[in-house]
């Protein structure tokens, strides 16, 4: 489990987002069970309990020589946009400050059926996964085995022209369309090198006549001795009905990071993340949100002490809203 002490501040010209110091402890745990069938196949079940003491993410999988099949409830996202991160604490955009960085759409917030290939089936360490959301227009719910469906209208929420909220930076979320399919491929072609990509496609998105929604990313990492580096790109196109004002139509992101193991106990890292939105016209100015982090972690047995200094430029895609 983790505990943290956060000290936010800001120096931007577009307003001050100073907040009081934050102190917290991990407030979620997982209940799990697994076993083996008479035919040699294995099964696994997991259920998360979150801070509100309610059932959260869940999954039930069956694994054999054919690979893994499973039902994933509100988890099992296949996006790879953050897989390359080498930060020793966490990505700069995944800390206590809600800077609102948008990456890609993902089915981790949906209920999905998934298939994963066996780890040793293909050469060069190639593995593939596919997730299918049969009701993409509905948010995931923690269903029992008696779950029933609801009306699937295939609609979507229009994107906004500027920042909307940290939960939905540009208004539109992955909850849209009648169905959605997410593909992921990873490989380890040579020692130290890993590469991968994902692509998410929607079907039956009603009235997305000007632009259909899609998103994806690719990444690469390389490790040699005490050094490791990572790089990734991500792209998202929002569903658009027709020109209406000046909606955000796409977001492109770039991330790179490097880590160094000073010794068996101490590691340091640097990461830079950028997210650049693009609108239908130049009427609305776009500002690139940038997050950088310098971090260090020291491990003693089963305990890790870590410190991070993260900086944000144009937080919430707002010009001059800079924080530390």
Model-based region annotation:
Residues 1-324:
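Outer-membrane beta-barrel proteins
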